[in-house]
């Protein structure tokens, strides 16, 4: 592809040779003379001056460099779209593999690809242009919208409801029983039936080995446009809003309420029945045990305001030094104070 054509498709201002041929995209240090790269973080600006890439996606105000530049408002977004141009994932032709098991009461939309050893249970409704790769299982009564893409070994349990353009990566489990038990008269833990389904909106991505549990009663809900990373656990009856990002190894206890446009970074935790308001950011390894107002940035365990947390962490790192200073002050004070006798009188 000529660089000029790529610039047009990305809506970029090109400064450089429009006839230059490019055939791929790589990181700033790996890209070669026929590939493009991008700089979204200013700390990598020096690398752009040394890159071997044919062209670099940059912001409009970026200084001139030897390589051609494709100037856009959001280099990271342009990079994402350029990847979609150069990288074409495998195509899966419509059809049903002979080893697939499909209940006769299931409704399969037009253009579906049903891979090897897929199991589709009774009364399933699967929308048009779905792709189910090997060993995907849809339990009875599942309803799924159009353009569903399920990678190998993902499972959707009974009566769960998924919208359009949902993607499940490998090993995802939607609708497994929530963690509910009650102690009986003999002191044994008795399993609480988990009767409520999971309801997932449109354009939701769930990454590998994440789990979203079904509700005891009611529903577990995931809003439109939300993206869930690897190894995330969402407990029963939790509600997650729209366009929220939940990063790897995060855990939401049962009945958590997460708002819209929230970012839960890696290894964060939210206690049961807590509400996290719209636009909140939890920084890595934060733990929330109380409601969080909209727009807050929270850090630490237990979590509190990020600005206070940063000051506290700075102070914590200085504790050994402060302890030494305090010890010196105490010794100086002791040297200037009169000592007491055994009867309490001054010597």
Residue ranges and their predicted role:
Residues 1-99, 160, 165, 171-172, ...:
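Terminal amphipathic alpha-helical/low-complexity segments used for targeting or macromolecular assembly
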